[in-house]
Swiss-Prot record:
Stretches assigned to the Cytoplasmic side: 33-64
Keywords in alphabetical order: Chloroplast, Membrane, Plastid, Plastid outer membrane, Transmembrane, Transmembrane helix
Chloroplast intermembrane side: 1-11
Name of the molecule in the record: Outer envelope membrane protein 7
Domain observations: The transmembrane plays critical roles in migration to the chloroplasts and/or subsequent insertion into the membrane.
Length: 64
């Protein structure tokens, strides 16, 4: 066997990576769909730190 060119090796590597990515997408499709839909439903303007601080303050006032 002779030496393979760098371009041919790169093509094989890229094709293998694409095939691997496709296999992962197919194998985990239900989980990825659920994850992506939950991201779409999330509110980017909501700050969880503000919510936690308000809930903690309310809880501490009720305890007194």
């Amino acid at each position: 066997m002779g030496k393979t060119s760098g371009a041919k090796q790169a093509t094989v590597v890229v094709a293998a990576m694409a095939l691997g990515w496709l296999a992962i997408e197919i194998a985990f499709k239900p989980f990825l769909d659920k994850f992506r839909s939950s991201i779409d439903k999330s509110d980017p303007t909501k700050d969880p730190d503000d919510f936690d601080t308000a809930a903690t303050a309310t809880t501490s006032k009720e305890g007194l």
